[in-house]
Amino acid sequence: MKRILITGGSGFLAAAGEAEVTETIQKLQPAAIVHAAALSDTGYCAQHPEEAHRANVELPVWVAKAACASGAKLLAFSSDQVYAGITQPGPLPETLPLQPINVYGRCKLEMEQRVLELCPDAVLLRASWMYDLPGYGLPIRGNLPLNLLRAALHGTSVTFSANDCRGVTYVRQVIANLAPALSLPGGVYNFGSSNTENMVHTAQQFAQELDIAVQIEAADWTRNLVMDGKKLEKAGIRFDTTQQGIRHCLRDYGLDSR
């Protein structure tokens, strides 16, 4: 069985320097590395750009150098935030010229470029907003269904814009698709669920599937982060749509009444 090193679980590498990262990878000699460690809070990154750059650019570059030196296949997570600032509608392909408008997106785009310069066979996965439910005793950050459930429980509202469009992905599909992703040719891939609905409609659909009543406040910001998945599909890897994904999630947890 091949040894795969997954970063991002304990925070060890995020606190380490380049020498420690290199030493760890040389010692473990993995056949592949899945680099999932990141500082992904966009607001925090905006307020702490140097820390964001270290975690989201410098660290993965160190990992890439060590991966190349050891011969390990590298798979690293990027983000749909690289598309922040794109004004065109519809699903966005990987080939678009990009100028992200937030610190996190700029860091992720720089990371992609620098990692591919070092390791042309590295696979960079642009992930969307992801979610799971708290059924495995694992820490879970705020996500769409949890935010809706908390709002319903406490009688508070959630805010979304009808001009905001993005995919929302069930994280266990991301996990299931990692093994085939390790066999992809080097390059950048959109990696998540498609969505033809705006975020107001998406939140309403999730609330309906969860069988809860939630007050949704309308905002007026405009954003399109919907990713085109054709490149990934041509390689044989597919995701549910955003709407199919929440139903898949509820079935997995035995909560789908259909």
Task: Report each predicted region and the residues it spans.
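Glycine-rich NAD(P)-binding loop of the Rossmann-fold in SDR/ketoreductase-type enzymes
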Residues: 47, 51-62, 98, 102, ...
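NAD(P)H-binding glycine-rich loop region in Rossmannoid oxidoreductase-like domains
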Residues: 22-55
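Amphipathic terminal alpha-helices
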Residues: 2, 242-258
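N-terminal Rossmann NAD(P)H-binding glycine-rich loop of SDR-like oxidoreductase domains
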Residues: 1-17
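NAD(P)-dependent short-chain dehydrogenase/reductase
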Residues: 113-166
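SDR active-site strand-loop-helix element
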Residues: 7, 33-37, 74-80, 86, ...
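Mid/C-terminal beta-alpha module of Rossmann-like enzyme folds, strongest
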Residues: 177-178, 183-223, 228-229, 258
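Conserved Rossmann-fold NAD(P)-dependent oxidoreductase catalytic core, especially the SDR/UDP-sugar
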Residues: 61-99
